[in-house]
Amino acid sequence: MRNLLVLTLFIFSSIATSNAAITVMSYNVENLFDSLDDPGKDDKAYLPYSLKQNKDHIEACNKVRVEKWKNECLYFDWTEAAKNKKLENIKKVILHSNKNGPDIIAFQEVENINVLSELFELLKPYGYIDLALLEGNDYRGIDTGYISKYKIDYKKLHKIKFSPEFKSKDTRPIFEVHIKIGEQLVRLYNIHFPAPYHPVGMRNDSFTTLENLVNKHSDPFIALGDFNVTSRESEEHNTFYKLEENWAISNHEGCIDCKGTHYYWRDKNWSYLDKIMISKNRGLAFNSSSITTVITEINTNDDKIPEGFDTKTGHGVSDHLPIFAEILL
């Protein structure tokens, strides 16, 4: 009888372990800045208009070559009220994705730990207990960060190792953190690869750096973020299908009704710039039916295309849609 009881407990324990799951989201929140001047960073566009009236600021802005960016630098009114409204919109989109929000959220384009902490405080009532952001070298100060319902045990930035022709260039590092789900260590890699206007080789080097990182250990891993590979580039270079031996990729596994995460108005087409990728053969699997982009009235226009935050109307969040998935362990 005792042996039967032990066997029964073992079976139920095994079932519970195999049914463990976490929900994750990646969200490029497009220029989530606080309203303060961050020394050493080029954040002068994201200040209140009242602080932009001095001669030094105006002269610095007039040196900006791109007209749109110059006008933002001179006239964009990024107040505390505007920032707080954007944070509230982000919170609502996150909570729309899943009851009380996903377990782990990887963010891209966050200025600093201060503004991430403000978002964390808004999300705390929904079970979030930890956050992480390490300052990288981006000249504008935009970084990657996490907010999590699991304790974050380890934090490290990994610089991209570029080929000789790109040695003079720098880009955002890969942000690795560790969490434990029960006794299982899971490694996460937050991605914000070089923008599409940079050479394809820079993104190829970024993928190589990521592959080298995950090949150094045998733990299950999740890479999620803004890979910045357009649909055209992906088709021409077979970017993601080449990875399928070792990776399961969100929009290959599910998201059947999704169009993409970013819309290019000039070309009138969608791209999956943002993805969730998980290790194959290391105990992880997607719940394919769970994979989706998060579309609400708050973060899209009438055509369900993502819209950046408008300080005048208070509508929008980002030119990216967040992507969400449940991952089984």
Question: Model-derived features: where do they sit?
Answer:
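Classical Sec-dependent N-terminal signal peptides that target proteins to the secretory pathway
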Residues: R2-A20
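Metal-dependent phosphoester-hydrolase catalytic domains
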Residues: T23, N212-I222, V229-L329
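Active-site beta-strand/loop signature of hydrolases that rely on acidic residues for catalysis
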Residues: V24-V29, C73-T79, K83, S97-L116, ...
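Solvent-exposed loop/turn segments at secondary-structure junctions
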Residues: V29-F33, V110-N114, G136-R140, K151-D153, ...
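Stable alpha-helical elements in mature extracytoplasmic
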Residues: K86-I90, N112-V115, D143, M202-L210, ...
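Extracytoplasmic, non-cytosolic globular domains
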Residues: I105, A132-L133, S163-P164, P173-C255
